Amino acid sequence: MTPPCLNCSIFPGALSPNASRSPLVCNISEFKWPYQPEDLNLTDEALRLKYLGPQQMKQFVPICVTYLLIFVVGTLGNGLTCTVILRNKTMRTPTNFYLFSLAVSDMLVLLVGLPLELYEMQQNYPFQLGASACYFRILLLETVCLASVLNVTALSVERYVAVVRPLQAKSVMTRAHVRRMVGAIWVLATLFSLPNTSLHGLSQLTVPCRGPVPDSAICSLVGPMDFYKLVVLTTALLFFCLPMVTISVLYLLIGLRLRRERMLLQVEVKGRKTAATQETSHRRIQLQDRGRRQVTKMLFALVVVFGICWAPFHADRIMWSLVYGHSTEGLHLAYQCVHIASGIFFYLGSAANPVLYSLMSTRFRETFLQALGLGTQCCHRRQPYHGSHNHIRLTTGSTLCDVGHRNSRDEPLAVNEDPGCQQETDPS
């Protein structure tokens, strides 16, 4: 039997940082992939460069500028969303509770995740914040990422119920129910983030027959790769593929429902006798068509943005788990491109959510301006119209808005001047 490495523990402290180490006292069989016997002749700096890469990412400057722009836009957008909902009681509707939870998760992604990633790009190693910070970082980022996806999915379900099943929405979509749902979202997100968190920790470059390389600690995967593959594949299935299919189907059903209501309204108008009644109805159809087109475009944008922003994130993790240990120069270059794109789109999603869900709403924007003293009351309401409106059309129109008003039991449904400003039923 070949003798083991002789007193390897003396090597790290016995030599200067730039000195080489002799392989004469070491058993060559001790070396396993990716380490090689010639590593004993390399300096610590050369070892770090070989196995950990440059200390600063080559594309750091352009990525830093891009991230800072996303950071400014995202923090302002999510901050405005939280401010409007917290400072205005009329905005504390069931729908807006989901928007508030989504804004909080996106804010945490931008305020915690983005600066830490920039820090690691600027200094890939060593990770100087300690093991506790490593665990906390993974747990927090994984939790807020999963919570963001669950919030988007829950909001899609809420909109489907409000539009397609309006009678059920009055009894189900209450403030108490939504609070329980939001709490369940964060609990589930935390629980599902634990497996990935448990697989990470501080990892230090350790060369056989030589020991740990100084200043090489990184916050990375330390658990079994097979288990990590299972975790990332399961996460991609449950928190990307399934939500993507869900919101796509729900928004398709919403669009079909709006189209069906338009056809029913046209049939109703044709059956009316007087020219004045038909003219009034045609104007109402035009207003509702404009509102429906706006809603349809927004729903399509939501699905596209969700797919574009989250697909690279999961592709990045799956690709890394598959190419680890089998990386060629071409695969490494491809992975670097995917990794950069995934980071940009990941944080871009957190910045785009408040624009898509909140700031695109006329009433939401004007309510914020009103809170700052820069705007007037939005959505001036006419007197309730007591004509022969279709019940489904009235209820659907009343649930497409993303802001609220006084309890709907105290105020009859009204026809609004602005089709993008329909009221929202707010049973509590």
From Swiss-Prot:
One of its GO terms (molecular function) is neuromedin U binding. Keywords: Cell membrane, Disulfide bond, G-protein coupled receptor, Glycoprotein, Membrane, Receptor, Transducer, Transmembrane, Transmembrane helix. It is found in: Cell membrane. The keyword Cell membrane applies. Pfam families: 7tm_1. Coiled coil: none annotated. Ubiquitously expressed. Residues 81-96, 159-181, 257-294, 361-428 are cytoplasmic. It is a multi-pass membrane protein. Belongs to the G-protein coupled receptor 1 family. This is Neuromedin-U receptor 1.
